[in-house]
Amino acid sequence: MDLTAALRRITENQDLSPDEMTAVFRTIMTGGATPAQIGGFLIGMRLKGETVQEMAAAASVMRELAERVDVGDDFHRLVDTCGTGGDARGTLNVSTAAAFVTAAGGIPVAKHGNRSVSGRSGSADLLEACGATLELSSEAVAECIRRVNVGFLFAPLHHSAMKHAVGPRKELGVRTLFNLVGPLSNPAGARRQLLGVFGQEWVRPVAEVLQALGSDHVLVVHAEDGLDEISIAAPTRIAELRNGQIEEYTVTPEDLGLRSAPLNEVTISGTKDSLAMIRAAFSGERIAAMELIAANAGAALYVGGEAPDLRRGVERARELMTSGAAAQTLERFVATTKELAQ
């Protein structure tokens, strides 16, 4: 199917079959579409509403074209904490901080991420502020995971085919299909994920996409306060994919043994602010930031198999911060990226 035919279909509110979506998305990702066609397609898909089958097909193309990171067969518990972003709440870099706590707890992490698109600080922005080198080869990223238990998969380096859609995405300035399929396309093939989404209506569908793609254990989350993380200020809706089955439920901060706090206690003005909060939490200060990081790192420890349930995952995450293990893992990561870049 060519793009013109696809545009005609979606403007008539008709869904694309998996084969049709695969063909269209491959055309976009290999430079066969004009900027106007790409922009029209993305807006048309958003207005129509992306289906599970369409998202799965798009993610499969992204995975196929990605620059892979091969960590070997010993890392079957590999976890990613990358979310969609786009919640516009301006909180600290929770998923990035959670990655280092999780790695300190013995679970290998392939943290997929980028610079800020909608938030005040993206994963890449934060890690550069820490002094890390992000522009590493795939082999160097894999080696970083082997040495430190965590590596950063900088999206522009691993999804170079995305360059064809960068211009239209920036000019559109709104959430598109790419926000949804990016976190579904981990270049290291992580089959375990904590994945925050920007709207509650996407919790179940994204879990269904990962079910179709063969993931092992995933929590897709969105909080009632709008946060695309597990929140300390409101209940969080979760779709859990495990053993091929999806279960939906809601957890409160109290359910997880968390101290509730308003989101303004974890709101940042920029990257420096975020880093200061994370360093304070990693030094053992029982601030709201520690609770928010523990909530999400605890979930990642759970999907990685290091905790039997969410509540005990949260307890373990706190221990890893108060003991200094998370801070040490971050320091080792920064030093290792510099060494591998030489």
UniProtKB/Swiss-Prot annotation:
InterPro entries: Anthranilate_Pribosyl_Tfrase (IPR005940), Glycosyl_Trfase_fam3 (IPR000312), Glycosyl_Trfase_fam3_N_dom (IPR017459), Glycosyl_Trfase_fam3_N_dom_sf (IPR036320), Nuc_phospho_transferase (IPR035902). Pfam families: Glycos_trans_3N, Glycos_transf_3. It comes from the Bacteria. Its EC number is 2.4.2.18. Its cofactor is Mg(2+). GO terms for molecular function: anthranilate phosphoribosyltransferase activity; magnesium ion binding. Homodimer. This is Anthranilate phosphoribosyltransferase. It comes from Halorhodospira halophila (strain DSM 244 / SL1). The lineage of its organism: Bacteria, Pseudomonadati, Pseudomonadota, Gammaproteobacteria, Chromatiales.
